[in-house]
Structure formats: C-alpha cells, structure tokens
Design a protein with these regions (language model features):
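Mixed-charge, Lys/Arg-rich low-complexity intrinsically disordered regions
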Residues: 1-11
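Short beta-strand-centered aromatic/proline hotspots
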Residues: 16, 22-33
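Hydrophobic residues embedded in beta-strands of well-ordered beta-sheets
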Residues: 34-35, 78, 101-103
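SH3/SH3-like beta-barrel fold
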Residues: 35-41
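Intrinsically disordered, low-complexity, charged/polar segments
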Residues: 44-72, 117-135
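Amphipathic, interaction-prone secondary-structure segments
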Residues: 72-99
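Intrinsically disordered, low-complexity regulatory segments enriched in Ser/Thr/Pro
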Residues: 93-121
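Charged phosphate-binding loop/patch that engages nucleotide di/tri-phosphates or the phosphate backbone
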Residues: 132, 136-146
Length: 146
C-alpha cells in the first residue's frame, strides 16, 4: 500500500483518494482537518477522513486508470527519457513517463520536439484533477474515473 498521506485541506470536492486499505473514494466535503467522501454503492453515510487517525491516501496514476478515461498512447517523443503522449487538448499536451503524467501548457513543436511555457508533473490522481480544474477543465476533472 502507498505510504504517502494527504492533508485533508489539500483536497478538493470531487478529488479521488483512498483509505488505508486502498479503497477508492471521492471527496464530497472538505474542512481544515477533515474531509468526507463517498463511494459507489454508499447509501448516503459519508466516510470521514481526518488528519490524525484516518488520513486520506493518494491514488497513483497508472496506465490502466488513463485507459479507463480513454487516454491512449498517441505517439512518443524522446526527451531525456521516453515520454508517451496520451492526450492533446487544445494548447495542452499530456505526456506519460515512468509513473508520472506531465501536463505541458501552451506547447509548441520546435526542432522535431516539444517545448512548453509551463510543465506540471502529477504522480497522483487528485493532483491531476486539481491541475485540470486550474486549466479550465473542471468537467473532465470531476468526471475522472478510477
């Protein structure tokens, strides 16, 4: 199981995280030191995370999760390491490499490669969801599947 923990206030409504057993849940409410979450089949009784005893844990981005959201490899580029392009959305390019999804903002093709004004790397699903929201893609972030 992943040893990383998240502070409750670092989450946003709609973010995916899991409990200490790896059970995935989606955040429904966030406070300073607590967060409530729900999961498929839940009958309205929210799960409570807190920063002391029941800390939320991140869900690592995997190839399977990307495929579940219809993000498929569209090509690759050789930078320092191999990066597989999994999605283009307007001025954004999403590259997958070694367990990390990088979002290239305002990317351009240059000398048979890519350059970008800003590059944000995400290892966890909740990080990706928050970057998508900041980039104006809230619908995609809130409908992300695990």
């Amino acid at each position: 199981m992943n040893a990383a923990k998240i502070k409750c206030r670092a989450l946003m409504v709609g973010d995916w995280c899991c409990d200490q057993h790896g059970f995935p849940m989606q955040i429904t409410n966030v406070g300073d030191d607590y967060a409530y979450a729900t999961f498929e089949g839940n009958e309205g009784d929210p799960w409570e995370f807190d920063d002391k005893d029941a800390k939320p844990q991140p869900i690592e981005i995997t190839e399977d999760i990307l495929k579940q959201n219809n993000w498929e490899v569209q090509g690759y580029t050789l930078l320092p390491n191999e990066h597989y392009c999994v999605k283009y959305i307007g001025k954004y390019c999403f590259l997958w490499s070694l367990g990390t999804l990088s979002i290239w903002f305002d990317h351009k093709h240059y000398n048979d490669g890519l350059i970008a004004d800003i590059i944000v790397s995400c290892k966890y699903v909740h990080q990706l969801q928050q970057v998508l929201r900041l980039a104006g893609m809230a619908e995609m972030a809130n409908n992300f599947k695990i």
